[in-house]
Amino acid sequence: MKALHFGAGNIGRGFIGKLLADAGIQLTFADVNQVVLDALNARHSYQVHVVGETEQVDTVSGVNAVSSIGDDVVDLIAQVDLVTTAVGPVVLERIAPAIAKGLVKRKEQGNESPLNIIACENMVRGTTQLKGHVMNALPEDAKAWVEEHVGFVDSAVDRIVPPSASATNDPLEVTVETFSEWIVDKTQFKGALPNIPGMELTDNLMAFVERKLFTLNTGHAITAYLGKLAGHQTIRDAILDEKIRAVVKGAMEESGAVLIKRYGFDADKHAAYIRKILGRFENPYLKDDVERVGRQPLRKLSAGDRLIKPLLGTLEYGLPHKNLIEGIAAAMHFRSEDDPQAQELAALIADKGPQAALAQISGLDANSEVVSEAVTAYKAMQ
């Protein structure tokens, strides 16, 4: 089996690329970073530090790399069995034209073996969005052929990969946590379902997408925002602060009650999932900066994201949300000189006041009880 993976950054190398290579798949990375491309093609291998209770170093070998903006990547799309991405939500639109060209070439060459494309991004149904961009870039006479022979498979991914602090200045070395989860929608594949260790198949993807968003992402963000307010540097420092831990755990339990109502998750298993996530935040090997995790507060306070979406669920089912409100209030206090969204948030609150600002960012009714609760909590933190 041959695969092409867009994005040779830390997540690409440390998570998806590693799983594919470990499964014995012939893997080529596509990227724009020439330093990384040259290093991969010189060595055809790299090291991954896997850190949890202990630390181990795995070597990923037998890999190649091409530029994601040249002809080589188009040629590969015409030949491979699987295309994956870890480029960030914004970049999906930029790689779509190359994918479209590759699919046209595949059609012209008469290659009708099934191709599956999986975007492994921190977003909901990212592959469906990528498909829209690819379809827009395709000529009309290729669209029906692509619909027949190419599967666009949505996925949910979860692994903490902090920015590398390699002591060796090796551009390929990467550190990842032990935990990883890659869940894919098995109803969207063309041809036989792949057997890749570490890839989990489901016919109910949205349940797992929301489980991750409402638990890992909600908890991570609230830990960062409360941690920043309390003067902590890292996620580990913050979660070891008992006051912060109580709110974070409480918020994940509140969002968990929504998941249990909505999807029928088992309450005991979900409690164990929450405990596992708290353990991940405590990982001493992950130097995960609260400022990095907290960045882009406007996006994180938007209606479909990790703070407001679970809150809306508690309103839908009439469930408690005191700790989620604390997290939202802390997010409104997030300030960072390096983050344009943090500066925009501060300006918005200074201009409109916290009530109108939160309503504008989140889509919540300015006169609603929850906005009033959040503003009260926000003022209590000043």
UniProtKB/Swiss-Prot annotation:
Residues that, per the record, bind NAD(+): A3, L4, H5, F6, G7, A8, G9, N10, I11, G12, R13, G14
Record key words, sorted: Acetylation, NAD, Oxidoreductase
Pfam families: Mannitol_dh, Mannitol_dh_C
Keyword NAD found: yes
GO term, biological process aspect, one: mannitol catabolic process
InterPro entries in the cross-refs: 6-PGluconate_DH-like_C_sf, 6PGD_dom2, Mannitol_1_phos_5_DH, Mannitol_DH, Mannitol_DH_C, Mannitol_DH_CS, Mannitol_DH_N, NAD(P)-bd_dom_sf
GO molecular function: mannitol-1-phosphate 5-dehydrogenase activity
Domain of life assignment: Bacteria
Positions of modified residues (N6-acetyllysine): K269
EC number: 1.1.1.17
Catalytic activity: D-mannitol 1-phosphate + NAD(+) = beta-D-fructose 6-phosphate + NADH + H(+)
Sequence intervals crossing the membrane: none
One annotated Gene Ontology cellular component of this protein: cytosol
Record keyword Plastid present: no
Family from the record: Belongs to the mannitol dehydrogenase family.
PANTHER family, sorted: ALTRONATE OXIDOREDUCTASE-RELATED, MANNITOL-1-PHOSPHATE 5-DEHYDROGENASE
NCBIfam families tied to this protein: PRK02318.1-2, PRK02318.1-3, PRK02318.1-4, PRK02318.2-2, PRK02318.2-5
Name this protein carries in UniProt: Mannitol-1-phosphate 5-dehydrogenase
Organism: Escherichia coli O17:K52:H18 (strain UMN026 / ExPEC)
